[in-house]
From Swiss-Prot:
Name of the protein this chain belongs to: Small ribosomal subunit protein uS9
Protein source organism: Neurospora crassa (strain ATCC 24698 / 74-OR23-1A / CBS 708.71 / DSM 1257 / FGSC 987)
SUPFAM superfamilies found in the cross-reference section: Ribosomal protein S5 domain 2-like
Protein family (similarity comment): Belongs to the universal ribosomal protein uS9 family.
Keywords assigned by UniProt, alphabetized: Cytoplasm, Ribonucleoprotein, Ribosomal protein
InterPro entries hit by this protein: Ribosomal_Su5_D2-typ_SF, Ribosomal_uS9, Ribosomal_uS9_CS, Ribsml_uS5_D2-typ_fold_subgr
Gene3D superfamilies in alphabetical order: 3.30.230.10
GO biological process: maturation of SSU-rRNA from tricistronic rRNA transcript (SSU-rRNA, 5.8S rRNA, LSU-rRNA); translation
Function field: Component of the ribosome, a large ribonucleoprotein complex responsible for the synthesis of proteins in the cell. The small ribosomal subunit (SSU) binds messenger RNAs (mRNAs) and translates the encoded message by selecting cognate aminoacyl-transfer RNA (tRNA) molecules. The large subunit (LSU) contains the ribosomal catalytic site termed the peptidyl transferase center (PTC), which catalyzes the formation of peptide bonds, thereby polymerizing the amino acids delivered by tRNAs into a polypeptide chain.
Length: 142
């Protein structure tokens, strides 16, 4: 029998995290590093949000391996947490049942919508007449 696997991605600004969720024993690795060792310690709590919210029992029978690139540290953490949440929902939708998928989805959306839906905000391009997108050079009348 072929392995039960789903592949999803999470995005934030320029950071993209690709998650592959397969049947396993609860292993979660980001770029080959275990989740408990990844990222600055302060941001690690953000990574654990979908896991703590849904309960570790939901993640006990799956392995999630993620590859993240682009963006900064914070963007990468947000992309990873989105990929983890989307991966577990997609796995439950495909291989478990529709009812449990819906309960997972509603729990995630009630907590934080960006766990499943990408943030559309992007950096606005710079325009002439100033040093940024909106700021203008100082005007002198005399």
């Amino acid at each position: 029998m072929a392995t039960q696997a789903v592949q999803v991605f999470g995005k934030k600004k320029n950071a993209t995290a690709v998650a592959r969720c397969v049947q396993g024993k609860g292993l979660i690795k980001v770029n080959g590093v275990p989740l408990k060792l990844y990222a600055p310690e302060i941001l690690r709590a953000k990574l654990y949000e979908p896991i703590l919210l849904l309960g570790t029992d939901k993640f006990a029978e799956v392995d999630i391996r993620l590859k993240v690139s682009g963006g900064g540290h914070v963007s990468q953490v947000y992309a990873v947490r989105q990929a983890i949440a989307k991966a577990i929902v997609a796995y439950y939708a495909k291989y478990v049942d529709e009812h449990s998928k819906n309960t997972l989805k509603t729990a995630l959306i009630q907590f934080d919508r960006t766990l499943l839906v990408a943030d559309p905000r992007r950096c606005e391009p710079k325009k002439f007449g100033g040093k940024g997108a909106r700021s203008r050079f100082q005007k002198s009348y005399r």
